[in-house]
C-alpha cells in the first residue's frame, strides 16, 4: 500500500476515529480521577470537575470526529500519511488541552520561588505559548493555498507575522490572559486559510477585502463547486487545531501559598488586574489599528498584482496582502485635482466632440431617425461568454461560438471587449457598462456594487428614463447577489426581475436557468408594452465551476489540446459546451427579434473569461511583456445588432475593439440618441484610446500601456479622464 498516494475512501475515516476514541478515553479517565481526587489528577482538577473538559480538548476532539465522518460523504481525498500525521497532531493538541493544568504545574511549580520569579516564569511561558499560537496560525492560513510557502519574502514575512500576532495579543489581554481569546483567533485564522484554499481551487485567486462585501453573492453561487478537502487544507486545519491546543496552556498565575506550598485554589481577579489587562489590550489594539492604517504597504513594496493576486499573497503573506488591499478600497483624489479643473477638461473634450464628431452625416441621419422612432434597447451580459479561439484555436481546431461569429453579419459592430475582471467579479463589468466609468480610474481591488450607494450617481437607466424609456433589469438568481437589488434601485431601474420571478420548473442548464428562459422574458416585455424599453439581462447558466459533470453526452464538446492535463481539458470542454448552448440560445433570440414589428437594438457581450484560461495562456504564449500577456485573459467579445435599418449605418459588422465603459456611449451614438457630456468625452477619447480596463489602455498603435505609465503617449488624456471620473462619480458617493 502506498501511504503517499491520494485516496478517496470512507476507510480514511478510521484513522481520525481511532485517535478520537483514544482522546475520549483519556478524557473519561481524567474526569473519573478528578471525581475520586486521586493522584492521577493535577491538584487544580480536584476542586472543580469542569476543569477537566476545557475547550482546548473539545475542539481537537470535534476536528477528529469531523475528519472521521467527512470521508464517508466524499469530502476528504488525501493520502494515508497526511491523514495519519494530521490526526496525530490533532490528538496531541487534545492531550495538551486535557492535561494543560498538569503541564503548567510541571513548568511553573517551584515551592521556593519568590513571587517575582513565579511572575517572570509565568510571563515567559505565556510569551512562548503565544509565539507558538501565532506560528500555528501562520501555517493555518498559508499552508492550504500557498504552494510556494518557503518563498515568502523575508521583509514581508516579518510584517505579515506581526499583523497576525497583534489580534492574538489583543484577545489575550481582553480575555484576562486566558486561553479563550487566542484560541478563537487561531480558529478564525484556520477558517481564513480554508476559505483561501477553496478560492484558490475554484477561482485561482485570493480573498480580497472587497470580497467581504460580496460574501452573500459567493454563498448564493456556492452550490456548483466541489468542497473535497485535500492535503494542503487538511494540514492547515491540523495547524489551527494545534494552535488551539497550545492556547489552552495560557492562564493567569493567581495562586498564593499555603504552608509553604502552592495553593491549588485560584484567587479571584481583582479590579486592578482587570484594569491592567484592559489597558494592555487597548494599547495593543491602538498599535494594531496604526499598523493597518499608517504604513502605506504599497509604497513599501507590498503592492498587489491584481492581474494575479494569488502570486502576491504567496510572496508577501495573506494577512499583509489583505491589509494592503484594504488600503486600496479608498478612491483617491487625483493629484492636482479640483472641480474647476475637471469641469474645464470635460468641456474641452465636449468641444472636440462638437467640432469633430457631432456634424458627421451618419450621426445626423441617426438623430433624425431617433426623433421619429425610439428603438428599444436590449443589453445581454452573458455569463463567462468569451471566444477561446483567440488561444490559437485551442490548438485543436476550435473556431469559437459559431452563430456569434458568423450569424450576425449585418451587425453594426462587433469585436474584442477589454474587461477588468477574470474568472469572477461580474458586477464590475456591469458597473462599467451602466455608468460609463472605467475601473482604471477607481483603483484596483474594489467592487463598486457592494460598497457604494448609486442614488446620486449618473447611470444609463436614469438617462434613458428622461427620454421616455421604461427600464427592467433581469438576473435569474438571488436579488441580493452583488447587492443588485439596492444598486439597481439607485441606478434608476423601474423593475428588477430575479429568480423569484421565474417558474420553479423553468428549464436549467449547467449552473442556472437557461439563457433562453431570460430571452423569453425579454420578448414578453417587448410584446406587452409599445413604449420604448431598456432591458438589461445578466444571464446565469454558464457560471463556474466546470467540473460539475452535468452536460448531456450529446452536447459535450471534445477538444483535447496537447500538452495540457486531462483534468484541465475536461474543464475546457464543460465550459465550451456551455458557450455552445449560449450561442444556440442567442441564435433563437435574434430570430425572434427579427419577427418583432418594432425597432430593437441588441447589445450582447461577455462579462469575463473563465479562470482556467491562464493555463493555456501561460503554456502557449511565452516571452511577452506581462501587460500584453495578461491582457489576453481580460478579453471577451461583444456585438451590437439591430432588427431594423439604422439610418447612417452600413451595418457591415465592423470590427471595433472597445471596452464596457465605452459601450453604452457607442450604442446611443449609433442609434442617434442624445448623449451626455461625459459620453461625448468618451467618444472623443476612443479616437486616441480605443480600449481601457483596470490594468491599462490600448493605443492606436496597437500597444497596451499601464494606467500609471506617465511616459505613454496617452498619459495626458488618461489624467483628464481620471479627473472627470472623480468629478462625476467619486465625489458624489455617499
State the predicted function of each range.
Residues 2-313:
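Transmembrane and membrane-interface helices of multi-pass
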Residues 33-45, 254-273, 340-341, 354-371, ...:
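Intrinsically disordered, low-complexity coil segments
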Residues 351-371, 381-382, 386-734:
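Solvent-exposed soluble domains appended to multi-pass membrane proteins
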Residues 290-379:
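Membrane-interface segments at or immediately adjacent to transmembrane helices
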Residues 220-223, 232-236, 342, 346-357, ...:
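Membrane-proximal soluble helical/coiled-coil segments
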Residues 212-215, 315-322, 339, 343, ...:
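Alpha-helix initiation and N-capping motif
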Residues 103, 136, 218, 319-322, ...:
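Generic structural signal of hydrophobic/aromatic residues within well-ordered alpha-helices
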